[in-house]
Amino acid sequence: MPQTVSFTRMKDGTKEDYALIYAAERRHAEGLVDRVLDALRALRPKEGEGMPLQVDRMEHCLQCATRAYRDGAGEEMVVAALLHDIGDELAPYNHCELGAAVLRPYVSERTYWIVKYHGIFQAHYYAKHVGLDPDARERYRSSPHYADCVEFCEKWDQESFDPGYQSLPLEFFEPMVRRIFAREPFMSDRAVAESAADA
């Protein structure tokens, strides 16, 4: 049986308890890339399921990443393009935020922002057909990342629903994903700053 902590309330935990927890968290984090790639694979629909698109959502992500790669985007952005929709299965109404949250500790503020807001920017292409505002992205025009998000959607995201496009396989991108997620997570300073701002 695995070793467990002594407490039933966190405030009663000891230094040894928290050392045990942190060691387990480090071991768990080692499998993160495999879980992220599994989440991407889960975008392949089961028989009789899926969206009525000409490609499934995993293929859409592969096309988006392939286009970014072939356009000479940096590795971080290629990985973001690959993973931008991984939240679709668990968070269909806020998938952008979930995907961005997964990437956030490992990517720049720019990349995080693009993934977080790409859904609003992507709506520019279809909103008028479903009774939404196609210019909703304009509320973010003052962001230093606005033009980059427009470009992400225009060149890669909205283009990537083509059954005739020759995308690269997931195996091509896996080493890139592993390198990005091997970075030292730099969320702590950002999290502290945001907690202070929210207080």
Predicted feature descriptions by range:
Residues 1-82, 86-199:
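Metal-dependent phosphohydrolase cores
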